[in-house]
């Protein structure tokens, strides 16, 4: 489904929080939305692989990577796993790599930067916790909508039809 965050903001301005414009699209799907699962990890993506093994239909993995630009938390292998398990997208407050491969995949991926250095894979981090970045506090279960214009967050799903 295509989402227009500008239109959604016009309709639901009282019900949405707008994430500061820090993010760029890296995936092949530039418009995506769904219920978020929050993760906090720093320069280690082992936990992301574990979570993306689950069925992701209608869900977005929202990763607080501390804004680190030293190691990429998402690469092509992780994105392919997410796509295989039907995730709608991945949002990373941090970096990605293998961007040419990422843009070929039909999944939404937004991050703040790209860098060629990969993350550790020890599985250090926490999931289903409150995270805060981009001027917004995110909780697992919230609903996120993203496109080339920006990202918005709502406690409840928005009526898009």
Swiss-Prot record:
InterPro entries: RraA, RraA/RraA-like, RraA/RraA-like_sf, RraA_gpbac
Disulfide bonds: none
Pfam families listed in its UniProt record: RraA-like
Gene3D superfamilies assigned: Ribonuclease E inhibitor RraA/RraA-like (3.50.30.40)
Alphabetical keyword list: Cytoplasm
Top-rank taxon: Bacteria
Localisation: Cytoplasm
An example Gene Ontology biological process: negative regulation of RNA catabolic process
GO CC terms of this entry: cytosol
GO molecular function, one term: endoribonuclease inhibitor activity
Main subcellular localisation: cytoplasm
Keyword Cytoplasm: yes
Coiled-coil zones: none
Family label: Belongs to the RraA family.
Complex and partners: Homotrimer. Binds to both RNA-binding sites in the C-terminal region of Rne and to RhlB.
Role of this protein: Globally modulates RNA abundance by binding to RNase E (Rne) and regulating its endonucleolytic activity. Can modulate Rne action in a substrate-dependent manner by altering the composition of the degradosome. Modulates RNA-binding and helicase activities of the degradosome.
Protein name: Regulator of ribonuclease activity A
Source species of the chain: Erwinia tasmaniensis (strain DSM 17950 / CFBP 7177 / CIP 109463 / NCPPB 4357 / Et1/99)
Record lineage: Bacteria, Pseudomonadati, Pseudomonadota, Gammaproteobacteria, Enterobacterales
